[in-house]
């Protein structure tokens, strides 16, 4: 059996290693793992394994944070495998340096490595994957080839490569927004490609904006752990206006409101005595930007950070296409609900990577050896799409703005895979006539029980 993994972040590497361990031939397509968003992950991974903590506490926090849109079975399934995920990492020699408290969590369960967790974990996984015989091709798998609802393979530079199974682990699409903390090339191309081919997307309207982005010479995240350590959010006049440890949707929205009032928002970390020791990389970055967190306020702004929705999969990470799977941020099966809790994403990456390998091994798919059409799409005007998404499908939404965004999108000449994804977000945000988690409608500011169900997008239509 030959398996292709599209994506070289934490989810993709975990799946590749788990399959290679069973003697399966695995090829990973994508950039160097150091260029993945997983590598940029700062705070850490939520593991409810310490004395005083519990799985049920973590489950409760996740469902409460997800505004009760979560698939409860999936939440239990992922979090109950926390110990296995923890041992997967520690068995590779990875050692965590501290535990932190972050917004929405009722216990300090965020295991971190010097608050630059991704930079320590990803190289270790890549090294072990290579030692296990995983093949790495540093090229982009442009399209997925499907025939009669069965996987055929992937196109790379126009060439069709045949595989028995394809696992999409390409991350989300925060790069579809003008301001993002991730890599700007994270446009969700594989997600849009599959949407064009009839694969359903789930909860695609839920985009998480990190409350405390720093836009300087480059965009950088000031980790949630800094607020967990006692930093306060204030206006230029020194006014505190939000509970810093509220969930990200609430904090991002309140910061954005202040900015709409014409007020600057700052993070006051001057009360953290050991800032340099606890957050060495953030400290170094800020010093390079001319800011000393021991005495200066840090200007912050919300930035697109994480896409909660994605390719619709079941609890075993299967799509409706035989032999096609999706994991990590690229996928959605209801784990996060309407709002992802901080540091739950890396846990999901590990668990979904391990679980999908079990699914593939159990199902033993056989790919179709058929010809498939290659489209060779051109990028087009992606920046115009980014402007539309930021202005019309951002932190605060309303019907007129969403409809205007759709009209503007029709006129843009851009990669159809990018356009269909932007269209999906706008249409599902329009269909969800309520506010829930990361989706906030100014014209429907409250949650409505009749909308406590997932949205499903299938080629041009969003169903709720």
Swiss-Prot record:
FAD binds at residues 8-11, 37-44, 329, 345-346. Pathway: Cofactor biosynthesis; NAD(+) biosynthesis; iminoaspartate from L-aspartate (oxidase route): step 1/1. InterPro entries: FAD-dep_OxRdtase_2_FAD-bd (IPR003953), FAD/NAD-bd_sf (IPR036188), Fum_R/Succ_DH_flav-like_C_sf (IPR037099), Fum_Rdtase/Succ_DH_flav-like_C (IPR015939), NadB (IPR005288), Succ_DH/fumarate_Rdtase_cat_sf (IPR027477). It catalyses: L-aspartate + O2 = iminosuccinate + H2O2. The active site is at residue 248. The record marks 102 as: Important in orienting the L-aspartate substrate. Its EC number is 1.4.3.16. Belongs to the FAD-dependent oxidoreductase 2 family. NadB subfamily. This is L-aspartate oxidase. It comes from Pyrococcus furiosus (strain ATCC 43587 / DSM 3638 / JCM 8422 / Vc1). The gene is nadB.
């Amino acid at each position: 059996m030959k398996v292709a993994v599209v994506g070289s972040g934490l989810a993709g590497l975990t799946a590749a290693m788990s399959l290679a361990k069973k003697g399966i031939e695995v090829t990973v397509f994508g950039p160097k793992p150091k260029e993945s968003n997983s590598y940029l992950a700062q705070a850490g991974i939520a593991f409810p394994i310490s004395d005083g903590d519990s799985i049920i506490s973590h489950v409760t926090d996740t469902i409460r944070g997800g505004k009760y849109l979560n698939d409860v079975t999936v939440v239990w399934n992922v979090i109950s495998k926390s110990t296995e995920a923890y041992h997967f990492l520690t068995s590779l020699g990875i050692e965590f340096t501290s535990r932190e408290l972050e917004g929405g969590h009722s216990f300090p369960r965020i295991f971190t490595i010097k608050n630059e967790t991704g930079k320590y974990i990803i190289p270790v996984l890549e090294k072990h994957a290579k030692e296990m015989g995983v093949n790495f091709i540093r090229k982009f798998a442009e399209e997925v080839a499907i025939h009669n609802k069965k996987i055929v393979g992937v196109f790379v530079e126009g060439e069709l490569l045949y595989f028995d199974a394809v696992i999409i682990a390409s991350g989300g699409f925060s790069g579809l927004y003008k301001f993002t903390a991730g890599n700007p090339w994270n446009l969700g191309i594989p997600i849009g490609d599959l949407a064009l081919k009839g694969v359903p997307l789930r909860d695609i309207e839920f985009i998480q904006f990190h409350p405390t982005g720093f836009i300087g010479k480059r965009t950088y995240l000031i980790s949630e752990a800094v607020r967990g350590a006692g930093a306060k959010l204030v206006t230029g006049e020194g006014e505190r206006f939000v509970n810093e440890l509220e969930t990200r949707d609430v904090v991002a929205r309140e910061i954005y409101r202040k900015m709409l009032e014409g007020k600057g928002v700052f993070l006051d970390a001057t009360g953290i005595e050991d800032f340099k020791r606890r957050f060495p990389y953030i400290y170094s970055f800020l010093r390079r930007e001319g800011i000393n967190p021991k005495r200066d306020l840090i200007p912050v702004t919300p930035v697109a950070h994480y896409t909660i929705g994605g390719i619709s999969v079941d609890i075993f990470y299967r799509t409706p296409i035989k032999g096609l799977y999706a994991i990590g941020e690229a996928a959605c099966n209801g784990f996060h609900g309407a709002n992802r809790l901080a540091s739950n994403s890396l846990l999901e990456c590990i668990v979904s990577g391990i679980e999908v390998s079990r699914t593939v091994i159990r199902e033993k798919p056989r790919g179709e050896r058929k010809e498939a059409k290659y489209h060779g799409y051109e990028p087009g005007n992606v920046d115009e799409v980014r402007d539309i998404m930021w202005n019309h499908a951002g932190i605060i939404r309303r019907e007129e703005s969403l409809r205007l965004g759709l009209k503007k999108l029709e006129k843009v000449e851009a990669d159809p895979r990018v356009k269909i994804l932007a269209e999906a977000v706008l249409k599902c945000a329009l269909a969800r006539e309520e506010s829930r988690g990361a989706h906030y409608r100014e014209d429907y500011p409250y949650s409505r029980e009749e909308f406590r169900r997932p949205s499903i997008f299938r080629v041009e239509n969003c169903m709720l």
